[in-house]
Amino acid sequence: MAAALARLGLRPVKQVRVQFCPFEKNVESTRTFLQTVSSEKVRSTNLNCSVIADVRHDGSEPCVDVLFGDGHRLIMRGAHLTALEMLTAFASHIRARDAAGSGDKPGADTGR
């Protein structure tokens, strides 16, 4: 998990919304994900990214909704995912968005 955290950054992310009911039994991984993304080190990678914790008392399924700056959306249902799986998926989407964004910029290195 430490390796996934070392490279985690929010540069292409516009908003992260984490929704869960704290009284359900399957929210630990979602809460761990929220704690990781809310850390000062990760938040400092993009000060314009808003991290929203939506805590409800309605028995709803834990959910993470990530909105990227290019309009791409990642929705993870946290009931049956571990924190590591959520962080790994999040990091891979961030790398994909970074690669897509850098390819659109003029003068970007094409590797030729």
UniProtKB/Swiss-Prot annotation:
Residues spanning the signal sequence: none
Subunit comment: Component of the mitochondrial large ribosomal subunit (mt-LSU). Mature mammalian 55S mitochondrial ribosomes consist of a small (28S) and a large (39S) subunit. The 28S small subunit contains a 12S ribosomal RNA (12S mt-rRNA) and 30 different proteins. The 39S large subunit contains a 16S rRNA (16S mt-rRNA), a copy of mitochondrial valine transfer RNA (mt-tRNA(Val)), which plays an integral structural role, and 52 different proteins. mL53 is located at the L7/L12 stalk.
GO cellular component, one term: mitochondrial inner membrane
Family, as annotated: Belongs to the mitochondrion-specific ribosomal protein mL53 family.
Lineage: Eukaryota, Metazoa, Chordata, Craniata, Vertebrata
Keyword hit for Mitochondrion: yes
Gene transcribed to yield this protein: MRPL53
Protein name as annotated: Large ribosomal subunit protein mL53
Major subcellular site: mitochondrion
Keywords of the record: Mitochondrion, Ribonucleoprotein, Ribosomal protein, Transit peptide
Disulfide bonds: none
Compartment(s) of residence: Mitochondrion
Keyword Transmembrane: no
One GO process term, biological-process aspect: mitochondrial translation
